[in-house]
Amino acid sequence: MSMPLSFTSAVSPVAAIPTPRAAAETRTAASLRHAGKSGPVASPSQNTLNAQNLLNTLVGDISAAAPTAAAAPGVTRGQQSQEGDYALALLAKDVYSLNGQGAAGFNRLSDSALLGFGIDPASLHDAGSGFQAGIYSNDKQYVLAFAGTNDWRDWLSNVRQATGYDDVQYNQAVAAAKSAKAAFGDALVIAGHSLGGGLAATAALATGTVAVTFNAAGVSDYTLNRLGIDPAAAKKDAEAGGIRRYSEQYDMLTSTQESTSLIPDAIGHNITLANNDTLTGIDDWRPSKHLDRSLTAHGIDKVISSMAEQKPWEAKANA
């Protein structure tokens, strides 16, 4: 696998989202400018100044209490779970919706913002193939997230790629990652769930980018070879910390991939999330109950719930 590359963007970054304090100050300045057009502005009284100072203080307190981009932990290479991985799980869920706006301090880049970075918004969504992705930013880090399996076209992508055939969604994922890498360099992280996890792993290996995946689809050696990637070297680097892959206990996809050599395993260092859905009594003898549990375990909502409860990034969990 190639070493991570560093690029310097030649375009202007997305304008920072104004804080409540900045917005209040902007509105005050605009009011004064407007008043200046219609006549001289009288000096504000001491009461007015006191009221404005109080307003600014209150706005500042509200801003400080709210989650900020600076408070969101960055995601870096490594085998151990990181707190920022939880934010990526939330984004891996958000990207399933075309109207998703982001989560955990990350905002989804608008079409105009993407164009400003030289990225074609149309390259992130293809109704024909089922491909769907989004790019998010907290002004410090950028996340390229891929949606997973949500219709029959995605299942076809799973089967084609796993059995060694060329698949358009994987090609689109690599192309999107190359564009994002050129724009954001080492500030880019890639994430995805299910099929999206397989896309994320492939895109990460093709661009030398850190990735975090959730209940990810496996990536075949045929796919890696086709992209000019040495499978053995890529898997070794991913296991060493290039890719962290979270798998929920009882997840049907992970269990199936690891129980047969006919389909590939997910790539990366595995972090297992314990599943607290215990089957007892007669339920433990009913295949339908086990199937229901494995299907639920595969969903991104269950992954998010387990991460929130277990906090695997804490030191005692990583010891």
Curated annotation (Swiss-Prot):
Its EC number is 3.1.1.32. The keyword Signal applies. It catalyses: a 1,2-diacyl-sn-glycero-3-phosphocholine + H2O = a 2-acyl-sn-glycero-3-phosphocholine + a fatty acid + H(+). Residues 1-24 form the signal peptide. It comes from the Bacteria. Disulfide bonds: none annotated. Keywords: Hydrolase, Lipid degradation, Lipid metabolism, Signal. It is an enzyme of class 3 (hydrolase). The keyword Lipid metabolism applies. InterPro entries: AB_hydrolase_fold. GO terms for molecular function: phospholipase A1 activity. One of its GO terms (biological process) is lipid catabolic process. This is Extracellular phospholipase A1. It comes from Serratia liquefaciens.
